A protein has these predicted regions:
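Conserved, mostly hydrophobic/aromatic
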Residues: 5, 25, 33, 61, ...
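Short, solvent-exposed turn/loop segments enriched in Gly/Ser/Thr/Pro and often Arg
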Residues: 8-9, 34-40, 71-80, 143-152, ...
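Aromatic-lined substrate-binding rim segments of carbohydrate-active enzymes
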Residues: 18-102, 129-133, 224-238, 242
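Polysaccharide-binding and catalytic clefts of secreted carbohydrate-active enzymes
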Residues: 93-277, 281-294
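Carbohydrate-binding surfaces of carbohydrate-active enzymes
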Residues: 286-333
Length: 333
């Protein structure tokens, strides 16, 4: 069993602490460290990949007899992405280009960044995943990859996304495959659309329900496919190690909120079909998860995995905070 801690969201902790921290991690009974390898940090300058800090960390892990799980944080994109791939910004449900920004839990890089339906964005993201895989696939103490952290793609969008031309084109293509033709869609939906360009996603409930539910279904399938594509890139350069992904919670509990559509991060059952395993996060104190809720979460993920590897990818071990709010310590079981 991999029993470990997450460490290093670049550039913290400072390098002067790494040696003593890894020594304490091992002495505390852990056997694994999970490291975030962030695209925005590694390729801060276009076409120049810098892994010096991660090289040192995996070296220290080996020295202290710790396995490593490497998380490819491709969704935290480089600050230059909009400049080098013009016209790739996400568009929200108000028709506004989304202004990306740094995330509260990571020091450098932007989210949501550019839309992965833009082929130029996906090409660059895939190259980061491939380059990272080639660099570390040969590690003797590599325990596996977490190919997509919490299945996040729209953090900091501040509204519903994505309505950019590339996503709309992908949505209409998905509809055509689903219904066979525009006539087939009109028959199923009881509509009179004259051309595919007239078919728009629903934005909110009752605007209208049919178009809204269809777009939500598309976003779920889109996330599933994106995870499969990430997996394919990594598997091509690492045919040996476990490749998983995990959501912030099981997909069955992902009901959406004012800034996200329900299950827009993919369906765990379909995700597991193309991955080596599936996982989830759990923050018992932060989200008031009791023992029954915790057990339900694990059972949901195990059900989706259907015999594949199951990881509790993140588990709150201490206090948590959002802004200046503070929370109590995690209660013992």
């Amino acid at each position: 069993m991999n029993f470990g801690v997450q460490y290093y969201r670049a550039p913290f902790p400072d390098a002067k602490h790494w040696e003593s921290d890894f020594k304490k991690i091992r002495e505390s009974g852990f056997n694994t460290v999970q490291l975030w390898i962030s695209w925005g940090w590694v390729e801060a300058t276009p076409d120049r990949f810098v892994y010096d800090d991660y090289d040192r960390l995996v070296e220290l892990a080996a020295k202290h007899r710790l396995g490593v799980v490497l998380s490819t944080i491709a969704e935290i994109q480089p600050n230059w992405i909009h400049r080098l791939v013009p016209g790739s910004e996400m568009v929200d449900n108000f028709g506004h280009k989304v202004v990306s920004s740094a995330r509260g839990e990571h020091h450098f890089g932007i989210t949501p960044g550019s839309c992965t339906d833009h082929p130029g964005v996906w090409e660059r993201m895939a190259r980061f995943i491939e380059t990272t895989g080639r660099r570390y696939a040969g590690l003797d103490h590599l325990r596996g990859w977490d190919i997509w952290n919490e299945l996040r793609w729209n953090v900091n969008a501040d509204a519903l996304v994505c309505f950019c031309p590339h996503t709309l084109a992908a949505y209409r293509c998905w509809l055509e495959k689903r219904f066979g033709s525009l006539e087939g869609l009109n028959e199923a939906w009881k509509r009179r659309y004259a051309c595919w360009e007239d078919v728009m996603p629903g934005k909110l409930p009752d605007r209208p329900y049919t178009e809204l539910m269809s777009f939500q279904h598309f976003l779920t399938c889109r996330a599933d496919e994106h995870a499969h594509r990430r997996y394919g890139v990594m598997r091509a350069v690492d045919p040996v190690h476990l490749i998983t992904a995990h959501g912030a919670c099981p997909s069955a509990l992902y009901s959406g909120d004012p800034g996200t559509y329900p299950v827009d991060r993919g369906n765990d059952w379909f995700l597991a079909d193309a991955l080596d395993g599936i996982g989830c996060s759990s923050f018992p104190q932060w989200f008031d998860v009791d023992d029954a809720d915790f057990g339900l979460r694990i059972d949901m993920v195990k059900s989706a995995a259907r015999g594949r590897k199951v990881w509790l990818s993140e588990l709150q071990g201490g206090r948590a905070a959002v802004g200046f709010n503070t929370y109590g310590v995690v209660r013992a079981a």
